[in-house]
Amino acid sequence: MATYVVGDLHGCFDELQLLLKQVNYNPAQDELWLTGDLVARGAKSLECLRFVKDPKNNAKTILGNHDLHLLATLLGIKKVKPNDQVDAIFAAEDRADLQNWLRNQPLLIQHPKYGFLLTHAGISPEWNLTETIACAREAEAVLQSGHYADYIAQMYENTPDHWSAEWQGIERWRYIINVFTRMRFCYADKRLDFACKLPVEDAPNELKPWFKLDNPLFHQQDIIFGHWASLMGKADKPNIYALDTGCAWGNHLTMIRWEDKQIFTQERLK
């Protein structure tokens, strides 16, 4: 049995199939894990959702920011972004089932055997492992509740930018969501920054990648994330794995086989 983890799909379904073919993926024996953002920029977002949802493929995903935005558009809260190719999802007969399935996906997974943490964007530099897991479960419970639309409608803000255990309600939930699905850079005092999307080498000096801040968890724990395509798979820490390599933007899709840490890639199809 092999454990495979793939970076952000963004609708790149054909590339995923070719990547799985490289390793002769066998869902009866192997596991497939994904870093979220199944949808949006590629042409086959619907196919990606259906593939991951189908139990026979033995695939599990976490939620990314584009997945949450899809939920917001399906709810009529937000408009589809000009470059998002999701019309087929809106027209699909199984749209309601896909929507309900998607909102029931986790924000964080800890692998039951290997213990690595799988998250879309990252983990707060202000949390330990217990807090990280508890905050994920708390935010997931809201998404899986009957009033999740009310929270999604208030999701699109950048505050609060720091953590306090005293936060309650939407402020607390929004911080958790932003950490798991949107975060890239932080200030030295661990406040989140949402303005900078530059490669690390081009970022202002006062900003650091979240995983470069002082937190014992970032040294002790294997962490796999996506979201940050401009890293091109380079986190420069032996236990931190960045898997989004911008397939939807013309680069390639990346997959790691966890048992031996071998990397497999598939170039974007023309």
Swiss-Prot record:
Membrane-spanning intervals of the chain: none
Catalytic activity: P(1),P(4)-bis(5'-adenosyl) tetraphosphate + H2O = 2 ADP + 2 H(+)
Enzyme class: hydrolase
Record InterPro entries: ApaH, Calcineurin-like_PHP_ApaH, Metallo-depent_PP-like
Highest taxon listed in the record's lineage: Bacteria
Annotated EC: 3.6.1.41
Pfam families: Metallophos (PF00149)
Keywords per UniProt: Hydrolase
MF term (GO), any: bis(5'-nucleosyl)-tetraphosphatase (symmetrical) activity
Matching NCBIfam families: apaH, PRK00166.1
Assigned protein family: Belongs to the Ap4A hydrolase family.
Role, per record: Hydrolyzes diadenosine 5',5'''-P1,P4-tetraphosphate to yield ADP.
Protein name: Bis(5'-nucleosyl)-tetraphosphatase, symmetrical
